[in-house]
C-alpha cells in the first residue's frame, strides 16, 4: 500500500496538474499530493492510523502485527502538556508529557522540544517508506500556550464568548499576539519538514464543526467553517 502511494505520487508530473491548491505558494510536493488525492477519489480508500507523539510508532506497529501491512496514511499530533490533578481524564488524545494512553499514562519527563523534534524524525522515516503524513494539533487556549488543563481544550458549553473571539482575531490585541506566539512554537518543526520536501496534510483545529473544543462551532465572519 505504501509503495503504491509512493509510485503514484512520483508519477504526478507538474505540467499535468489539474487541481489548483488554495495556497498559490504550495510546494511541488504538496501539489503532487493534492493531485494524487483527487486522482483516486471515488476509486480507492486509503487506510490510516493515528499515533501519539509520546510513542509515535506504537499503534502503527499494532496494525502491522494484525494485518502484515502498514497503513499508507500515518498521522500524529503536536499535542499539549496536560497540567493539574486530572491529567488522566484527557489521556485519550495523548498529551505529550504523558506516556502512551490506555496504559499507565505516567509523566514521561521529556521536554516539548525533545518530543516535537522526535516527531519530525519519525515523520522523515515514515515518509521515506512512501507514507502520506497528516498532522493535527490539540492545542490549549492561546493564553496558555502549550501547557494547560485539558478543560482549556475541551470547553464544551464554556467555549469563548463573542467578545473573546473578536479579541483573538483582531490584529494586535493581547490575545491575538498570544495566539500568534502559540502558533510560532510549531513553525520550526513544520519548516524542517518543508525543507525536507515532505508534504503534510496539516489540520490544526480539527473537528471545528463539533461543539467540544474551544475553537468549535463559531459562526460569523471569522468563523471556523
Q: Which residues make up each language-model segment?
A:
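C-terminal motif of bacterial Sec signal peptides marking the signal peptidase cleavage site
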Residues: 10-11
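Short, flexible loop/turn elements at secondary-structure junctions
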Residues: 49-52, 75-82, 137-141, 206-208
